[in-house]
Amino acid sequence: MDQLVSRLLLYGDLGEESILGKLAGIFQEWKGSATPRQVLVRGIYDQVKRLLDLATDYGFDEDLWQNYLTFLLMTNENSFSLITERVGELDGTVNHFAKSDFGVFRALFHYDFSVIERDLGIDCFTTLRHYKAIYKHERRYNKNVSEKVRALSQKLAAAPDEERFFHLVTEHYKQYGVGLIGLNKAFRIQSGPHGVGLIPIYNTDKVMLKDLVGYESQKEQLRANTEAFLAGRSANNALLYGDAGTGKSSSVKALINEYYDQGLRMIEIYKHQFRDLSAVIAMVKNRNYRFIIFIDDLSFEENEVEYKFLKAVIEGGVETKPDNILLYATSNRRNLIRETWKDRADMEHDNDVHHSDTLEEKLSLSARFGVRINYSIPNRNQFKDIVLTLAKRQGLMLPEEVILAEANKWELRHGGVSGRTAQQFINYLAGTQTETNE
């Protein structure tokens, strides 16, 4: 194994601390026969445990060794994988080196562990190659990554030669990209002593636009702007504003489920992180994806100045915002920044003779969102339609008049008519029906 790993060139930066790197070192020690057997076994078990932990996090199954090697290929960001992500299969000398590396990986895929297992009296590798994972709820592992790793792993295992292996890997890079950005739909920002990083959000909401009852014109505006963005045409930053509980956030979250396979990714950012926006944009501006930077429930009080960071990023900075980035925000306020009568009064505004400029600065933020979509509370008839549609989806077998009568009681006690209120009511009703059936 150590001789195979030493031949890696483009993928040779796995690091000595990687599982594959550690195992290669142990195999080299084993051939030297100077290291005590129990030390070698302990070293192997340490790496097998790491592999099992990784398999648990990503829901690997059947052949964990091949799953792990596939995961390495899918996440290793090197000059070849990053360029292939952008332009697809390359036609150049670099292919020679890539195919050589893939020949190594194909040999590792089918590596015979029986000799070392017999010599050390272990069977851990055989067990890893025929593994049956315990069922886990999808919220406990990264299902999206798991499905892609296992699907590609099976194809690579069946590849008859390095040429086919090469085509399968490059096709994956072109379709899904490379690294955690390629594998995951959504991310949050994490700031630390070593800078700003993106942390995958493993369990995203499964909502689709069709799940949001009503608001057809609003969804169509959002869909049209997003599809133009994905097609490389001109598109605008979008502000979804209006009443609480009307589906603004759900509409934006649905986009990554609708368009993930077309290269859409989402980065969620909070108000206190706006100063990190420039760093985040620098990280993703050259990647072959379209990123929506999502700001939920956006608003500012009069003494908050974070909106200045946002304005600089949206428009007006020295560096032009990359074409692969848009900002989508939701807010209960159309103007985003709280405006007081003090802003309009000459004498009460610290003698600011240019008070209209001060006012304009505050109001200009919402104007920088080229698409502004209003989500207002439904009327009574629309609320009834939402309730009955959700009840049908839930499979509730109650008469319509009973459902609507209970819905009216519920909304009077829970904040009025809205899509959120309707969903909360249906959740409650479904729970009581389950208790009754039991």
Predicted features and spans:
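C-terminal alpha-helical "lid" subdomain
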Residues: 372, 376-438
